Each structure stands twice: as C-alpha cells, then as structure tokens.
C-alpha cells in the first residue's frame, strides 16, 4: 500500500511538472512569434542565411580588407630638341623647369643631345652631353631657395664653394654639382651619384596572395618562420637593363648627397634621345616596378637616331609610363604617314621586362596597359599649308586656323594615330624652326628655299588614362636651339592602399548573442558607426 501511495505521489508530481513545461513552452512560443527573426534563429541558421551574414561572429577576429584612397600629385613634363648642342655653364634651367611651382615628379625628355651624325648613330654613343644635362637638372631642382634665380654669382658659387645644395660635408668630393664643365663628365658616375640608394627601391611590392589557401592558413603562414617566406624576396626574371638606367649597388648606409630634395629615379640615352625621371625624396619608398625599353625607328627602321625611350614604374598602386620620342622628319606630303607608322611600331614593339611570377603583380608590359601614360617629344608633325600661307596666318595671330591644319590634330581626328590619347589646347606660337640665337623663324632672314622651314608645332605632350588633369601647357623662350622647349604640369591621381591596421569590420558589436532557453526575452543587438 505504501509503495502504491508513493507511486501516486510521483505520478502527481510528474503531471504537475509536465503541465508547467507545456505552459512555459506555450509562453516562449508566444513571445518568439512576436520577436524579430534575427533574435530567435539559431546560430547555425544565421550562418546559412545570406541576408544576415554579418552576424557571423567568427569574422570579427580578422582585420578589414585593405582599402584604397586617392591622392593627387603634381607631375611636370618637358620636351626639348636641343639641335645637337652641348650645354655650357651659362645655361640656367630653373625657368625651364618652373622650379618655383615645385612638382612631385619631373620628367625631362630631350632630342638631339648629340648631332645625329653617322659616328654617333653607327659607332660610339657620346655620353658627355647627357651627363651635363643631368648636372644642370639636378642643380636647378636642388638649388637652395635663398639663391636668386637670376644670380650669376650665386650660380657660379654653387659649383665652386663647399656648401652647395648637393655637396656638403664628407659627400662634397663625390657630389655631382662640384663637376667642372671643363672636365670630361662621366654619365655612369654622375647617374650613380644622383640616384637614390638602391635599397630604398622595391622591385615588386605587390602582395603574394594564394587564393587556394584559407584566410586562417595565410595568417598562420604570415607569422611562421620568416626565413621560409619568399613572398618579399621575389627576384625578377629576364631583368636586364642599360647601365645608365637602374640603381647601381650603393651601400645602404650611404647618405644622400647634401640631402637632395629630388633624386634621379631613372635615366636612359639612345643616340640623341635622353629621358630622365626625378622624384621628390619622400616619394621614393613608394616607387616600384621600375623598368625600361627603347625602340629604334631611324636608319633602316631600326637605328636609334629616331624612335623612343620608355620608362615604366608604379607609384603606390598606380602604374605610369613615360615615353620620349623623336619621330620621322620631313614636311613633304605623305611624311605624316611615316610618323603615324613610327607611333604604331613604338606601341607594338615596346615591351617591358616581366618582373615576377606573382600573378597579383600589377606591372604592365605594354605602353597602353598602364594606368597613366604621358608621351612627350619632337613628334615632327607639321602644318599642312605652304610657307607663305602659314606666314600670313602667323602675322595675323590666327592660330586657330593654323591648328585646324596641324597634321597631328588632323591625324588624331581621323583616328589614324594616338587613339585614346588627349592633348591640351595650344595657346602658344609654333615651336619650330627658329634661326640660331634668334626669335625669327628660319626663312625670314634668307631667300633660300632649301633652308626655309614652315613654322610648326613639332614639340608636343599628350596623355592617356583616367585621373589626369592638365593644369598648364606652355612653351619656353630660350634661344639655345632652333626648337623652343614645351612644358606641361598635370594633376595626377594615384591609388594609395591603406592596410587598416588594428581596425575591424564595421557594423556589429563583438558581444556574443545567445538565446537561453529558460529566459525567452528578446535581446537587444548593438550597432556602432
């Protein structure tokens, strides 16, 4: 009897418990039915729901993906056919380089720095004029600001005293500005002195990303033994360059001569063509992928008396290509087609060396594949009018009519050359051909038709790509050559990658959200900006 009574008590208690459980379950169901689905879904359900994937808390331990911001730089370009003349110590390039309006990059292209004689074209390349141009450019860019632009005394003193902008202290003996123009300058030695320490330039700074490996595995690999990680030591393949081009091996401890504000990034000569790229010192750590190529289009369509030099590089995450060219000459009908052919062959045959096997390396191998292309030079396009017709329009300052007959404008408008390139509006007089040391065009002083040339805008600067705005397009007035120099300043956008170190994904708090079965109360989920 006692056992039966105990069983009845147990049955009674189980019945009460089951009734209580049913009522609690009913209450919880009622609450959950009126609650946002974001609260009552299980963790597994939340993971599988693409609509609320942001609540996957396992992603909070990883940093945000790198973002890209846009910055604007000033880029100065200049082109000058110097007619085979070698500069002397009286030539001041400060006005030519517009140094008072300091740019971030300076790209200086010259044509005919040596006479285009058979000896220079076929035998030995004369490097002395190129060395002198480098010395003059460096002196203009790195001259102390307190010196007057027009002070000849200051100009002479800067080359003879012991405290010039590029020679101070122990570096004086090797500083380029101490070079006497009566000595025989050595381009290799000068370019080594002007160039930045090679340890500051990365051949390739693109990250190596293995998409077949998960994020956790990549993170573990990053913090593994650094001696086993070769991603930061990628060696270029087939990376051979001219001795004048890239940085010679300089000890990492070597100081910059005189702490120059601008350093030579690259330079190259091909017979009379000479191109150099200079950068503000602060930008040097962000320059990479530096490569060079040249294409000869002169005698037999191959030699270097005509053609181009091209320099490719990346600044931050943006690729640049600078092209300096000297195209086929002549003002006879049909000569413009030869110039068109030169441009086509340059675009076809310019091929920059491949740097690395890294598939994520953004180092274009062709000119048109770059983000920003800046093309300068003596393009040699003429005005499709007679000398007499051109002279009348010049005397009337009717440049609009002249520019309508400009061969480059006509050929570009017809889509036969420089497809996709742009040129700023021209507000200056034709740059070729002038009499020696004169402001008069050749032909005004003589009756000989052989020496007469129809004035033309031979010297031009064009560009291709997004994020480029031309701020100025002018010519210089130096009488040094039968060409007037042409300069342009651009505002150029570059992509800068931000790594977001120490930051996490925005949108949700890192607090775990759990639904406890015994407490069916809606939880508040926090957000922050």
UniProtKB/Swiss-Prot annotation:
GO BP, one annotated term: phosphatidylinositol dephosphorylation
InterPro entries: Endo/exonu/phosph_ase_sf (IPR036691), IP5P_plant (IPR045849), IPPc (IPR000300)
EC number: 3.1.3.-
Residue segments, region Catalytic 1: 371-386
Keywords: Hydrolase
Family note: Belongs to the inositol polyphosphate 5-phosphatase family.
Main function: May be involved in the regulation of root hairs development. Required for restricting both the size of the root-hair initiation site and the width of the root hairs during the transition to tip growth, but is not required for normal subsequent tip growth.
Protein name in the entry: Type I inositol polyphosphate 5-phosphatase 5
